[in-house]
């Protein structure tokens, strides 16, 4: 307390009122204060060579403590460090300013809370502090030699720090010796006290091995991804038909389908029952007309090919025919009659619109047609004549066709009917003539 009484500048300082970490005795020596003894526990258990280096720096710190010029600059960045590092730095500032007449009140005011941080943060996790100090290590002022001096003073007068604080203290003055805050090169003589490899998590081997392991993991992942891309089926284009094949198959399919007597709707329904994929009549029609996309044509071709094989194999088997007929309605074959045969049937119809069964049989034999075909043709012809003949006409179609003979007689007949006078309300001649005119034009 002799220093506080003799020095008027430190009378109101909070460093002495709150219990300074270090005190200066009357003989000029340095000893630990009571607050420092109660706040920390355990002695300094370090390497003897480090103690020797610290003792050498302590002598330089004692000589530098008389000039307070470096302390005013050092205080500007001491308070910007993390809590644990700032606590150790503030303790060093307080120790150096104890015998300096140039100490200002802001330094003394910041000394007390930083001293409390030394007490409260003595058990902090060294991982957090080591990471933070590792990134903030280059923050040194221009007076780097003075910073090394008060760093050694801190190491000499606070020997009872815990293991984590010792590491933080080592990180304070183990910054890279090549650069300063302003980016200028430091003097050649200023070197780091602690080898960067001793800092936990900053070893080059660990960093290199971690980087190598990460790179190796990425390389394996890239190989797996590349192998996954190239592991698709190699036989994707072997069975793909060409456009010419699809066109030929569509034409052949249409001919065979008509020959078998199935409609497009029957084929679509049969595909749904046999293979599980129901297709509409429009889809089958578009396939035959080559109006589907190439992809859909390729998908539909094997199904239609299977259906054709099934239909061909079931031609002589009643059970197979019934199986296919159950998928849809089987249409009868459409009969196409030649022009000469149709003329013979027409002439026979004019003579006898309703032939008997014997006449139909003899006519079918003469024309080499089936009996059912001849019978159906006469039925359809009578229905057609009934649609063309209006009701109330006294003349029969046979009489009309027998009178017509050729087109000239028809024209004369229409002229005569149109030149007659106004008909009576009950007369139907004009209406009948116009109706016959429509019938003849239709033929």
From Swiss-Prot:
The keyword Phosphoprotein applies. The keyword Nucleus applies. It is found in: Nucleus. Residues 210-225 have a biased composition (Basic residues). GO terms for cellular component: nucleus. Residues 21-40, 100-150, 182-244 are annotated as: Disordered. Keywords: Developmental protein, DNA-binding, Homeobox, Nucleus, Phosphoprotein, Transcription, Transcription regulation. It comes from the Eukaryota. SMART domains: HOX, POU. Gene3D superfamilies: Homeodomain-like, lambda repressor-like DNA-binding domains. The modification Phosphoserine is found at residue 317. Residues 238-312 form the POU-specific domain. Residues 101-121 have a biased composition (Polar residues). Residues 330-389 bind DNA. One of its GO terms (molecular function) is DNA-binding transcription factor activity, RNA polymerase II-specific. GO terms for biological process: brain development; regulation of transcription by RNA polymerase II. Predominantly expressed in the central nervous system. Pfam families: Homeodomain (PF00046), Pou (PF00157). Transcription factor that may play important roles in patterning the embryonic brain. Belongs to the POU transcription factor family. Class-3 subfamily. This is POU domain, class 3, transcription factor 3-B. It comes from Danio rerio (Zebrafish). The lineage of its organism: Eukaryota, Metazoa, Chordata, Craniata, Vertebrata. The gene is pou3f3b.
């Amino acid at each position: 307390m002799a220093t506080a009484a003799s020095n008027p500048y430190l009378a109101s300082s909070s460093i002495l009122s709150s219990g300074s970490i270090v005190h200066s005795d009357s003989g000029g020596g340095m000893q630990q204060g009571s607050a420092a003894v109660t706040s920390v526990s355990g002695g300094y258990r370090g390497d003897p060579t480090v103690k020797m280096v610290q003792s050498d720096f302590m002598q330089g710190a004692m000589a530098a403590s008389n000039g307070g010029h470096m302390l005013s600059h050092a205080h500007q960045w001491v308070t910007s460090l993390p809590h644990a590092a700032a606590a150790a730095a503030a303790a060093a500032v307080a120790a150096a300013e104890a015998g300096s007449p140039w100490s200002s009140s802001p330094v003394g005011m910041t000394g007390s809370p930083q001293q409390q941080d030394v007490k409260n943060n003595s058990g902090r996790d060294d991982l957090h502090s080591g990471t933070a100090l590792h990134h903030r290590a280059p923050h040194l002022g221009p007076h780097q030699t003075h910073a090394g001096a008060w760093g050694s003073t801190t190491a000499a007068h606070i020997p009872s720090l815990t293991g984590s604080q010792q590491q933080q203290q080592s990180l304070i003055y183990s910054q890279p010796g090549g650069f300063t805050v302003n980016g200028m090169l430091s003097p050649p003589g200023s070197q780091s006290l602690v080898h960067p490899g001793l800092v936990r998590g900053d070893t080059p081997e660990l960093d290199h091995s971690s980087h190598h392991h990460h790179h190796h993991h990425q390389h394996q992942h890239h190989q797996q991804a590349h192998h996954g891309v190239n592991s698709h089926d190699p036989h994707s284009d072997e069975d793909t038909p060409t456009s010419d094949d699809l066109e030929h198959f569509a034409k052949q399919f249409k001919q065979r389908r008509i020959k078998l007597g199935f409609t497009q709707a029957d084929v679509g329904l049969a595909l749904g029952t046999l293979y599980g994929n129901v297709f509409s009549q429009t889809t089958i029609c578009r396939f035959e007309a080559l109006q589907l996309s190439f992809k859909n044509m390729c998908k539909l071709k094997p199904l239609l090919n299977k259906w054709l094989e099934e239909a061909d194999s079931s031609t002589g088997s009643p059970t197979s025919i019934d199986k296919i007929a159950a998928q849809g309605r089987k249409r009868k074959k459409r009969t196409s009659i030649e022009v000469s045969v149709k003329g013979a049937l027409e002439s026979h119809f004019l003579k006898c619109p309703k032939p008997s069964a014997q006449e139909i049989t003899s006519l079918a034999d003469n024309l080499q047609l089936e009996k059912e075909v001849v019978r159906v043709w006469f039925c359809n012809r009578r229905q057609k004549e009934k649609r063309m003949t209006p009701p109330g006409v006294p003349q029969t179609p046979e009489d009309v066709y027998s009178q017509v003979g050729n087109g000239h007689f028809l024209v004369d007949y229409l002229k005569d009917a149109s030149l007659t006078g106004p008909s009576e309300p009950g007369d139907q001649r004009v209406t009948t003539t116009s109706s016959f005119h429509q019938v003849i034009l239709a033929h």
